[in-house]
């Protein structure tokens, strides 16, 4: 699916999304109920080791055969049953998501209701990529402010950090929350440079160092005043607990696909809530399928910071859900329809589909 504009980060440029969807049919008595999952892997293994073609391969060759031998498949079984296969959390998450969606539809209940979410809407932030010029960046940010987004996140990298942040802070003023995301672009030796961002009163700096460098993040947290938030580093509840314990993680970005699914995402939320660590829900340029589920998840009480759950139109001119995600007065509604909170626009999906593969027991 083409993006409405190129989205550049420190690891590359996205102009379209090659999206892998999973559709399952679960038997409930005499009926079949469908469920949908969205794999958040990118086309290339740049954000993480996973990529779309690889995710499809591992699903077909290794993951689905292990699920098919079960007498009945439940969302709670997916992670345990697939634990013998190392890695591939995004592929596993897409399968769990599809099964969970089907289970909830069969029970005629919503994900938000099962989670006990009480709020009716969540604040919406927007992620702004690296631009060709400061003028282009400022025009984009002003447009998002005009659209009502309550928090701005800027992608940064060496050579595109201090000046863009200074210019954007001047544009939006001191009261609008502003944060930056480095996507692992810096090294331990960059602490003095990153401390120059402190004067801009940032909400956080996200994943400044490589994902495996928890100690480096802990040391950086002592060098700068801006809170350090982890993204790529947090792959499970266990790793999250370790990161918090060593002082590497003052704030957590929870992405269900990155951690293996929504059930693990809830466990991470619960641990962070108990530890007093604020969390927010990150984005992977999802369609309305993933955005709806994320909006329900982000209604949990530990999600105290605005996430990257923006409107469908932030990235796509035409979404593949019947009711695209909208931002109204800076808020996204928490979906309450059965399942994960969306219905498929089959005409739009058919128009965007490039190939199909069917796997059966």
Q: Residue locations for each model-derived region?
A:
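A short glycine-rich beta-strand->turn/loop micro-motif centered on a GG-aromatic cluster
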Residues: 63, 208-209, 281
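Residue-level marker of alpha-helix boundaries and capping positions
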Residues: 90-91, 131, 207-208, 259, ...
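Catalytic beta/alpha-barrel core
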Residues: 150-158, 179-184, 201-212, 227-235, ...
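Shared catalytic-loop signature of beta/alpha-barrel
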Residues: 212-229, 234-331
């Amino acid at each position: 699916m083409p993006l409405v504009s190129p989205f550049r980060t420190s690891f590359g440029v996205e102009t379209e999304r090659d999206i892998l969807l999973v559709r399952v049919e679960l038997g409930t008595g005499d009926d079949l109920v469908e469920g949908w999952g969205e794999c958040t892997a990118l086309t290339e293994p740049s954000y993480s080791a996973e990529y779309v073609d690889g995710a499809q391969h591992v699903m077909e060759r290794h993951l689905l055969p292990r699920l098919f031998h079960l007498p009945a498949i439940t969302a709670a079984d997916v992670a345990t049953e697939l634990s013998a296969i190392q890695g591939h959390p995004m592929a596993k998450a897409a399968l769990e998501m599809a099964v969970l969606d089907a289970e909830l539809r069969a029970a005629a209940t919503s994900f938000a209701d099962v989670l006990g979410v009480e709020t009716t809407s969540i604040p919406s932030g927007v992620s702004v990529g690296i631009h060709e010029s400061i003028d282009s960046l400022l025009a984009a940010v002003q447009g998002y402010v005009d659209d009502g987004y309550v928090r701005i996140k800027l992608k940064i990298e060496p050579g595109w950090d201090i000046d863009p942040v200074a210019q954007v802070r001047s544009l939006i003023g001191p009261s609008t929350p502003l944060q930056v995301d480095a996507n692992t672009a810096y090294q331990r030796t960059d602490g003095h440079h990153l401390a120059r961002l402190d004067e801009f009163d940032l909400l956080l700096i996200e994943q400044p160092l490589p994902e495996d460098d928890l100690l480096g993040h802990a040391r950086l947290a002592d060098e700068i005043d801006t809170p350090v938030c982890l993204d790529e580093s947090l792959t499970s509840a266990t790793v999250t607990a370790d990161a918090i314990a060593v002082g590497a993680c003052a704030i957590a970005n929870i992405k269900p696909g990155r951690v293996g699914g929504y059930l693990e995402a809830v466990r991470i939320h619960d641990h962070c809530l108990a530890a007093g660590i604020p969390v927010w829900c990150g984005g992977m340029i999802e369609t309305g399928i993933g955005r709806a589920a994320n909006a329900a998840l982000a209604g949990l009480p530990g999600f105290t910071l605005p996430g990257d759950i923006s409107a469908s139109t932030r990235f796509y001119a035409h979404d593949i859900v019947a009711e695209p995600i909208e931002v109204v007065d800076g808020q996204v509604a928490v979906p309450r329809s059965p399942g994960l909170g969306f219905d498929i626009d089959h005409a739009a999906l058919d128009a965007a589909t490039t190939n199909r593969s069917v796997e059966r027991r």
